[in-house]
């Protein structure tokens, strides 16, 4: 088996209707470099708590996208070229992957760049978002 194998892609939409509007990015955001910031978090499950499934996380994400509806939108530009988020409720990108590696084998405290790339969804890896303008990418392994 590969170190990490992607087994599914989904767009997780908000659990209930959200406002349909456009939000300008702040002036600070306009001067920042335009790219997604990868972040990886590892959690060892507590013995008394059941390990969440991908379905559990998708349900939680859909509920969170209601008050934080901009994350279900898409980056775009206004007619005059200003960057903004169009709140479309299209959803957040969710990739599900499996691995036979333990956290220790993966190198949790000192992961290699190669291993990190296996877990972070990259632009172009989302087949349902051809324009690569999603505001939020998730990967569950």
Task: Pin down the residues of each PLM region.
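Non-catalytic N-terminal regions of enzymes
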Residues: 1-141
């Amino acid at each position: 088996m590969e170190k990490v194998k992607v087994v599914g892609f989904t767009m997780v939409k908000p659990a209930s209707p959200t406002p349909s509007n456009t939000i300008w990015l702040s002036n600070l955001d306009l001067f920042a470099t335009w790219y997604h910031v990868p972040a990886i978090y590892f959690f060892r499950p507590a013995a008394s708590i059941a390990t969440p499934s991908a379905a559990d996380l998708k349900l939680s994400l859909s509920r969170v996208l209601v008050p934080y509806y901009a994350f279900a939108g898409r980056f775009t530009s206004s007619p005059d070229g200003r960057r903004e988020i169009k709140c479309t409720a299209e959803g957040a990108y969710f990739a599900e992957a499996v691995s036979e590696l333990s956290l220790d084998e993966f190198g949790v405290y000192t992961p290699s760049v190669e291993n990190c790339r296996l877990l972070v969804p990259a632009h172009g890896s989302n087949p349902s978002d051809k324009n690569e303008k999603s505001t939020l990418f998730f990967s569950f392994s």
